[in-house]
Amino acid sequence: MKFARILMIVLLVALGVTVATAQDAELGSEENPIQVFFVPSAEAQTLITGGEVLADALTEATGLSFEVSVPTSYAATVEAMCAAPDASMGFIPAAGYVIGNSRCGLEVEAAAVRFGWPVYWAAYIVPRDSDIYTFSDLEGRSWAYPDSGSTSGFIVPSVELQSAGITPGEEIEAGGHNQAVLAVYNGEAEFATVYFSPPLTPNFNWNYGDLPEPYDLTVDEAFVTDEGRLFVGDTRILDARSAVAEQAPDVVDAIRILRISDAIPNDTMAFGPDFPEELRTQIFEALVAFSETEAWAESALGADDGYSWTTLAPADDSNFDPVRLQFEVLGLTEEDVFAD
């Protein structure tokens, strides 16, 4: 009995030393890696695989260790970051950042740039043969959206629909932008709201106010390259439909864009409030350098079926005041956005 008691004491002391060692270890060490979180706006396994590519590149550039996670929802991502204020970084959309900043002081360091654009849009998509032709036609129609914490997929469309006096019918939380597109493609929803980035056409610069589909009369010419990129003729498609092109090669022929929203600040790279400033700068600079390499396209940030960032640029908290205003105008609370 005495021996067992002594053994138990020794084990408890050893466990305490192990826990204390992990807690006291320098941030970025193997014992205390930097926690990197990705919102599940794309397929989780794609983000995990691409996240490891990103983590390996950062480790090579900085000597720091990183641990990649894809929580089950936007809300869970914010909660995880807030739970590790001195060790977390995450790639989260504008609405998630605004909520995280209010909840626990998350701080933005940078924002995405996609093919030169510091902003993006929400797209309302419908079957190409649908009888939905105007915004008001969405009244009573079934609506698929990625996640209630998605800025382009839910927050901005909610504001616009309510402001226009439009009440959708059945609401389907699809689980991601890909899934929302597929919900329309498979006939499970009459419309969906997803992210929109402008198409790329040689010798043509798309501007806000142009048709979201300047190629709509030639959609039967759509094709998917060996790299999984979606084209219509020589125009590359970059909106959410492109992310499911390998699963649904005829997605552009099957789904059209009804309209797009006003511009939205791009997704963020944010840090916990107590994350060391010098490491933030080091990580940002390493990511910018990494974005200029071919390997970037294999990372969660740069992959076409990931976040499709071209690079990232410094961002200020005030950039997200328009999103805060939308919350205030509609009286939205954190509970409204992240309700179960």
What are these regions (language model features)?
Residues 38-40, 70-75, 83-104, 112, ...:
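Beta->alpha turn/N-cap motifs
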Residues 7-16:
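Bacterial N-terminal signal peptides
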Residues 28-53, 213-214, 219-223, 227-237, ...:
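An extracytoplasmic/periplasmic, membrane-proximal ligand-sensing/linker region
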Residues 25-95:
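Extracytoplasmic small-molecule ligand-binding "clamshell" domains
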Residues 142, 148-276:
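Pocket-lining segment of extracytoplasmic ligand-binding domains
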Residues 31, 36-61, 118-189, 197-201, ...:
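Bilobed "Venus flytrap"/periplasmic-binding protein-like clamshell domains
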Residues 40, 121-132, 261-278:
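A bilobed periplasmic-binding-protein/Venus flytrap-type ligand-binding module shared by bacterial periplasmic
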Residues 79-137, 145, 149:
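Acidic, polar ligand-binding/catalytic clefts
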